[in-house]
Amino acid sequence: MAFQTQGSNLRALLVEDIKVNRMILSQMLRKFQVETTVVQNGKEAVELFLGGETFDIVLTDNLMPIMTGPEAISKIRAMGATDVMIVGVSVDANSMEEFKDAGADLCVPKLKLEILEHILQETRSKKNKSSA
């Protein structure tokens, strides 16, 4: 089940199965006024892209029920979604490699406000250049 928060000109998709992590990451994105859609597994993320939804950035966990983050990334990239910044979030070193192999742009072990701010600035800059 997806839900959204509204704000800036950036659209984010948060893919996370653990409720407390969803809440924390959603609050972080809200702090930067990012319009955020939240889903609980990779399958739900893929279904949004199949339905024509577009996002500027995707933040995804690795291990989730139904479909993992790397599986979702591979499917999203295979659909031609190459402009979206995809960030894998996991403390597991093996996950980092899985994310990169699947097509993630970036992998972070823990998302801190400073790191998220930098990623969002980079994403905004990329979006502004492509729409200019």
From Swiss-Prot:
GO biological process: cytokinin-activated signaling pathway; phosphorelay signal transduction system
Gene3D superfamilies assigned to the protein according to its UniProt record, in alphabetical order: 3.40.50.2300
Modifications made to the protein after synthesis: Two-component system major event consists of a His-to-Asp phosphorelay between a sensor histidine kinase (HK) and a response regulator (RR). In plants, the His-to-Asp phosphorelay involves an additional intermediate named Histidine-containing phosphotransfer protein (HPt). This multistep phosphorelay consists of a His-Asp-His-Asp sequential transfer of a phosphate group between first a His and an Asp of the HK protein, followed by the transfer to a conserved His of the HPt protein and finally the transfer to an Asp in the receiver domain of the RR protein.
Residues carrying 4-aspartylphosphate: D61
SUPFAM superfamilies linked: CheY-like
Keywords: Activator, Cytokinin signaling pathway, Phosphoprotein, Two-component regulatory system
Cleaved signal peptide residues: none
Domain Response regulatory: 11-125
Membership in a protein family: Belongs to the ARR family. Type-C subfamily.
PANTHER family, A to Z: TWO-COMPONENT RESPONSE REGULATOR, TWO-COMPONENT RESPONSE REGULATOR ORR42
Function: Functions as a response regulator involved in His-to-Asp phosphorelay signal transduction system. Phosphorylation of the Asp residue in the receiver domain activates the ability of the protein to promote the transcription of target genes. May directly activate some type-A response regulators in response to cytokinins.
Stated name of the protein: Two-component response regulator ORR42
Protein's organism: Oryza sativa subsp. japonica
